[in-house]
């Protein structure tokens, strides 16, 4: 009786969907109040003047203005000036 062994199962073949994180507005760019500047996991960037921090660590503009990235004592801050 001719038999055929069953094929082995693969442990690969999965991937998660991308989360679209990162900087959405560059330094020197004009933004309106409420616009998202950075989407991040944790505080890679910290909120500065006229910027807010969402519960998922998203940084957004509180007022209309120009985006400014500043480093102070090893931390990156985002200001709207």
UniProtKB/Swiss-Prot annotation:
The keyword Ribonucleoprotein applies. Residues 1-21 are annotated as: Disordered. GO terms for biological process: translation. Keywords: Ribonucleoprotein, Ribosomal protein. Pfam families: Ribosomal_L27. SUPFAM superfamilies: Ribosomal L27 protein-like. Residues 1-11 have a biased composition (Polar residues). The keyword Phosphoprotein does not apply. One of its GO terms (molecular function) is structural constituent of ribosome. One of its GO terms (cellular component) is cytosolic large ribosomal subunit. Belongs to the bacterial ribosomal protein bL27 family. This is Large ribosomal subunit protein bL27. It comes from Borrelia hermsii (strain HS1 / DAH). The lineage of its organism: Bacteria, Pseudomonadati, Spirochaetota, Spirochaetia, Spirochaetales.
């Amino acid at each position: 009786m001719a038999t055929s062994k069953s094929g082995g199962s693969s442990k690969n073949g999965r991937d998660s969907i991308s989360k679209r994180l990162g900087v959405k507005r560059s330094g020197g760019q004009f933004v309106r109040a409420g616009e998202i500047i950075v989407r991040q996991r944790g505080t890679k960037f910290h909120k500065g003047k006229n910027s807010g921090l969402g519960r998922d660590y998203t940084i957004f503009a509180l007022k209309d203005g120009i985006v400014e990235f500043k480093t102070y004592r090893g931390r990156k801050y985002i200001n709207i000036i």
